[in-house]
Amino acid sequence: MDLRSRTDDALDMELHAGFDAPEIARAVLTEKTLTGLISSISPLVNRLRDSILIFSDEGLIIHCSLETEQLYIPIPANMFDQYNWTGPRMVVLAATEGRSSLIDAFRHTKDPSTPTRLYFKFTGQPPERSIIQTMVWQRPGDCGPDDQVQCYKQVVKRELACYTMMFPNLTPDISICLKRDQFTRLQRLLKTFGFTTCFILTATDMYIQTAGGGFISFNVSLDINGSKPTPYNLIRSITNSKRILNNVVYGSGSMREFGVLLETHSGFRSAVQNLKLTRDETCYINFYLALTNSPMVGLYIQRSAPVHSFFYATFLSPKDLKEKLTSMQLFANTESVKDEPPLKKRRNLLTKRNEKNTGNKMGGKLPETTWQEGIGIREYCVAPPVDPAGTLDYSELSRESDVICTVK
């Protein structure tokens, strides 16, 4: 529909024509805010099409299940360009019986159909309220390159009258911060190995181990009870301080030696593999240890639309903890690993060896080894490197919809 001559008020009246029920609440996202949310949520859209949307006076929460685990994406009310809410919490299924979903508005596309504005209008009284989502975008017109035509699409859904949901609100006992490069190491580990995931923390180190013998380790500089972080001893590492500093992670909480084993590896693996960090974003691995019978590991991505996920775990027995810790520390301190030449020298040696074997001094391909760039001294993998983590595509699932109205 051509909306080139419409003002905002006229556009608003036309968009909601045909829905005569009085408006009880409204939420609006304009292009600037919506662009940041799309970049954060778009990699997870395939997993969120069948999610649940929860609106309240605090804002919007997108909730879905990832494998057997729970994932939450909160969008607070102050992030919306306009947010007016009255009444109790409202829960809506995002999926419809067709191909449309309320989450489609947060999908990034290469064509001009990426939305520039997003409206949510709420009508009715609980427990029979309705939500009208209006997505507005621009497409090229027929009168030249400067001609832009505004189009819109509407989806109408009714709220769920009966539901049960879990919203963890515990404060983590220990929180460890990973930068993008450190998070990439975790993604690589989980793509290479599988079946189980184990976290072990000591006073100075954190180990993440998977079945098959693969593990990564970080030196922990901890902020205890709000004080300044305890600096990691770098005296012995002055000759290679940059590499060591890249292996230091910062955290907060009351550090103690413990180990936890995730109950389901696939859910944690899927969550990590579906997340991509920019240079300005960080990942927090949170440990909830207050409940001794059911500890949890949390994953928190700090971004425009932060991502929270929680995974149940079990404590390792003192015997298993000691055995795993001893084996990893022994392997980390072996002279064979320490005596490995630096990365640049290793690559030069591989190149010369390849030239000697192939007789090709120009354009010789490096053999696939575990010591290629990105796999260093404190990252032990026994399989060839893999491609960077990507988004897993899953088939779409549909659910029954109350009403769907699409206008173009």
Curated annotation (Swiss-Prot):
Motif (Nuclear localization signal): 344-353
Molecular function GO labels: DNA binding
InterPro entries assigned: DNA_clamp_sf, Herpes_UL42
Keywords: DNA replication, DNA-binding, Host nucleus
GO biological process: DNA replication
Subcellular location, record wording: Host nucleus
Gene Ontology CC: host cell nucleus
Top-level taxonomic group: Viruses
Predominant cellular place of this UniProt entry's protein: host cell
Function as written in the Swiss-Prot or TrEMBL entry: Plays an essential role in viral DNA replication by acting as the polymerase accessory subunit. Associates with the viral polymerase to increase its processivity and forms high-affinity direct interactions with DNA. Facilitates the origin-binding protein loading onto DNA thus increasing its ability to assemble into a functional complex capable of unwinding duplex DNA.
Family label: Belongs to the herpesviridae DNA polymerase processivity factor family.
Subunit structure: Interacts with the DNA polymerase catalytic subunit. Interacts with the origin-binding protein.
Protein name per the record: DNA polymerase processivity factor
Source organism per UniProt: Varicella-zoster virus (strain Oka vaccine) (HHV-3)
